Swiss-Prot record:
Its EC number is 4.3.2.10. The lineage of its organism: Bacteria, Pseudomonadati, Pseudomonadota, Gammaproteobacteria, Pseudomonadales. GO terms for molecular function: imidazoleglycerol-phosphate synthase activity; lyase activity. Heterodimer of HisH and HisF. It comes from Pseudomonas putida (strain ATCC 47054 / DSM 6125 / CFBP 8728 / NCIMB 11950 / KT2440). InterPro entries: Aldolase_TIM, His_biosynth, HisF, IGPS_HisA/HisF, RibuloseP-bd_barrel. This is Imidazole glycerol phosphate synthase subunit HisF.
Length: 256
C-alpha cells in the first residue's frame, strides 16, 4: 500500500509575523502565525512547518513563545527551524511543543551535530533543511550547491552528496528548498527534487516555487518527493488545503 503523501503549509516567520518573499527577498506580511496555523489545522493540513527566517541571519533564537502558543492550539505535527545550533536549542523547541526540529546552517558548520541530535532525540524528530541553487551551466551535468544563512552564503557543497551524508548521520527527513524557484510560483525544481529523492531512503519534502495545484502533484509524481510544502498559494487565499488534496487525489496520489 502506497504511503499517503503529505501537504505541508509553511510559515516563514520574521519578528513574530508570517511573511512571504521571492527568492528569499522582497518580503510581504501574511499575518499572525498562530491564527494562520490554526486555520490550516482546521482545513486538514497534514503538518505545519514554522521557519524563523530571521534567526540564523541575526543570530537570534527561535521564538519559543510563538511555538508554545502554536502548539497549544494546533494538533497536527509541527516542525520548527531557524537558528537551531545546539542540543539545548532542540530540547527547548521540543519542550515548547515542536514535534520535529529543522537544522540548516548549523549542519553545514558542524555535520556531527546532526548525528548527535539524532542519537539524543531520535531520527524521527530531526529534519535537515537544504537550500539548493543550480550552479551547472547549459550542457553540463546538472549540479546543485548548498547555500546557508537564508540563502545568502555559498558553501561549495554538492546538494545530492550532502543530502546522502545527512541521511547517513541520522537525519529522519530532508526539507529541500530550491532557491532558484522560491516564491517564483512556476513550480518546483523537479531536477534537484528527483535527484535527492531517488538517492535517499528517507522522506524528502519539496519546497520552493508552488504557484498552482498541478505543481504540488508534479512534486510527487515527477519529483518523487514524499511531501510537498507551500506558502503563498495558501496564505493569500488562492487555494485551500482541501482543494489541494482533492486535486492530488484526482491525479492518483494517495493523500490522508
Amino acid at each position: 500500500m502506497a504511503l499517503a503523501k503529505r501537504i505541508i503549509p509553511c510559515l516563514d516567520v520574521d519578528n513574530g509575523r508570517v511573511v512571504k518573499g521571492v527568492k528569499f527577498e522582497n518580503i510581504r506580511d501574511a499575518g499572525d502565525p498562530v491564527e494562520i496555523a490554526r486555520r490550516y489545522d482546521e482545513q486538514g493540513a497534514d503538518e505545519i512547518t514554522f521557519l524563523d527566517i530571521t534567526a540564523s541571519v541575526d543570530g537570534r533564537d527561535t521564538t519559543l513563545h510563538t511555538v508554545e502558543r502554536m502548539a497549544s492550539q494546533v494538533f497536527i505535527p509541527l516542525t520548527v527551524g531557524g537558528g537551531v545550533r545546539t542540543v539545548q536549542d532542540i530540547r527547548n523547541l521540543l519542550n515548547a511543543g515542536a514535534d520535529k526540529v529543522s537544522i540548516n546552517t548549523a549542519a553545514v558548520f558542524n555535520p556531527e551535530f546532526v548525528g548527535e541530535a539524532a542519537d539524543r532525540f531520535g531520527s524521527q524528530c530531526i529534519v535537515v533543511a537544504i537550500d539548493a541553487k543550480k550552479v551547472s551551466g547549459p550542457g553540463e551535468a546538472p549540479r546543485w550547491e548548498i547555500f546557508t544563512h537564508g540563502g545568502r552564503k555559498p558553501t561549495g557543497l554538492d546538494a545530492v552528496e550532502w543530502a546522502k551524508k545527512m541521511e547517513g548521520l541520522g537525519a529522519g527527513e530532508i526539507l529541500l528548498t530550491s532557491m532558484d524557484q522560491d516564491g517564483m510560483k512556476n513550480g518546483f525544481d523537479l531536477g534537484v527534487t528527483r535527484a535527492i529523492s531517488d538517492a535517499l531512503g528517507i522522506p524528502v519534502i519539496a519546497s520552493g516555487g508552488v504557484g498552482n495545484l498541478q505543481h504540488l502533484a508534479d512534486g510527487i509524481l515527477e519529483g518523487h518527493a514524499s511531501a510537498v510544502l507551500a506558502a503563498s498559494i495558501f496564505h493569500f487565499g488562492e487555494y485551500t488545503v482541501p482543494e489541494a488534496k482533492a486535486y492530488m487525489a484526482s491525479r492518483g496520489i494517495v493523500v490522508r
